[in-house]
UniProtKB/Swiss-Prot annotation:
Subunit structure: Monomer.
Principal subcellular localization: membrane
Side Cytoplasmic, residues: 1-21, 128-176, 290-373
Family stated for the protein in its record: Belongs to the pannexin family.
Lineage, highest ranks first: Eukaryota, Metazoa, Ecdysozoa, Arthropoda, Hexapoda
Gene Ontology terms: biological process: gap junction assembly; monoatomic ion transmembrane transport; response to light stimulus
Gene, per the UniProt record: shakB
Name listed for the protein in its UniProt record: Innexin shaking-B
CC annotations in GO: gap junction; plasma membrane
Top-level taxon: Eukaryota
UniProt key word Membrane: yes
Function, as annotated: Structural component of the gap junctions at electrical synapses in distal and mid-depth levels in the lamina.
């Protein structure tokens, strides 16, 4: 079991080359590890232990009844969830169902699919990362040329800096499409986490979207007057109806009480995922707004470069941003996070000097204004 968990580290191994943002990494690293771990836990509990244990008379073999109720779902009665336990009902939602209507029955058929659903969710969270990794194509790593460690001879260092500078000079204003692909991947991450909230809401018959809020409300209110949302969605005890032929050839109905110990685990998993997905949604939404500001505000690009790379002179940053486009800014920002700070400062200064002394890359615009993307 521990070996399996250790194997997850290689699945979402984070490269020493930084090509994305911390929020983006939360989606494909932390979240994937969480979902895969939960899937393994549920799978282990489901196939190693007893995920369901139904109680009935000896007329029906226990393994037959357990298998039937596991496959064909169980149910509880909505009208009995607010009844007093120990007096009116043995457990919330469990009672006499002989005259219960179909509308009063709360059917539970999700539990055998939880481990597969969690695994599928993990794949969806990793998909934007896989897409960006394919589109990025190792560009940052190739341009670094081991200049991130800064330990090489001065001659070799000058040669590599000149190669990097020549690339930036020859390809200036040609990186917009490359940057927009990354922004698309961040937007896909936002769509994914929101879509998964709706997916789980459908998975739990419309009960998941407000699950976390309902739990908080229940904890703050008088619990005798409110239905526990965790017990309602993840009951520990339910009912199952089994039909078989009697000795006379007539169909006999048998009601069984089923214990679902796996729901103790499922309850904790999904209350955590609800809050985690809300946090991811908020952070990713803020990131998208941040990207929009960067696209339309060159002055913000200048400010961010100055804030992040303080060794680079302000006039050099302003010249580069004025003569380049948004995609170039994105590439330089990514390079700055990976290169040795002194080397990055030198490259930026050399690029600014070359732009200042040569009008070949001048972008038409209003005099005195920083050129828009």
């Amino acid at each position: 079991m521990l070996d399996i968990f250790r194997g997850l580290k290689s699945l979402v191994k984070i490269s020493h080359v930084n090509t994305d943002s911390p929020v983006f990494r939360l989606h494909y690293s932390i979240t994937v590890i969480i979902l895969m771990s939960f899937s393994l836990i549920v799978t282990t509990r489901q196939y190693v232990g007893n995920p369901i244990d139904c109680v009935h008379t000896k007329d029906i073999p226990a393994d037959v009844l357990n298998t039937y109720c596991w496959i064909h779902s169980t149910f509880a009665l909505k009208s009995l969830f607010l009844k007093e336990v120990g007096k009116d009902v043995p457990y919330p939602g469990v009672g006499n169902s002989a005259e219960a209507t179909a509308a009063d029955k709360k059917i539970y058929k999700y539990y055998q699919w939880v481990c597969f659903c969690l695994f599928f969710q993990a794949i969806l969270f990793y998909t934007p990362r896989w897409l960006w990794k394919s589109w990025e194509g190792g560009k940052i790593h190739a341009l670094m040329m081991d200049l991130d460690i800064g330990i090489c001879s001065e001659i070799e260092k000058k040669q590599k800096k000149k190669l990097l500078l020549d690339y930036l000079w020859d390809n200036l204003r040609y990186h917009n499409w490359w940057a927009y692909r990354y922004y698309v991947c961040e937007f896909l991450s936002l769509c994914n986490v929101i879509g998964q909230m709706f997916l789980m809401n459908r998975f739990f018959d419309g009960e998941f979207m407000t699950f976390g809020l309902d739990v908080i409300t229940h904890m703050e209110a008088d619990q005798e007057d409110r239905m526990d949302p965790m017990i309602y969605i993840f009951p520990r005890m339910t009912k199952c109806t089994f039909y078989k032929y009697g000795v006379s050839g007539e169909v006999e109905r048998h009601d069984a009480i089923c214990i679902l110990p796996l729901n103790v685990v499922n309850e904790k998993i999904y209350i955590f995922l609800w809050f985690w997905f809300i946090i991811l949604t908020i952070l990713t939404t803020l990131t998208i707004f941040y990207r929009i500001i960067i696209i339309f505000s060159p002055r913000m690009r200048v400010y961010l470069l100055r804030l992040r790379f303080r060794l680079v002179r302000r006039d050099a940053i302003e010249i580069i941003v004025r003569r380049s486009k948004m995609g170039d800014w994105f590439l330089l920002y990514r390079l700055g996070e990976n290169l040795d700070s002194i080397i990055f400062r030198d490259v930026m200064q050399d690029l600014a000097n070359r732009l200042h002394n040569n009008q070949h890359h001048r972008v038409p615009g209003m005099k005195g204004e920083i050129q828009d993307a």
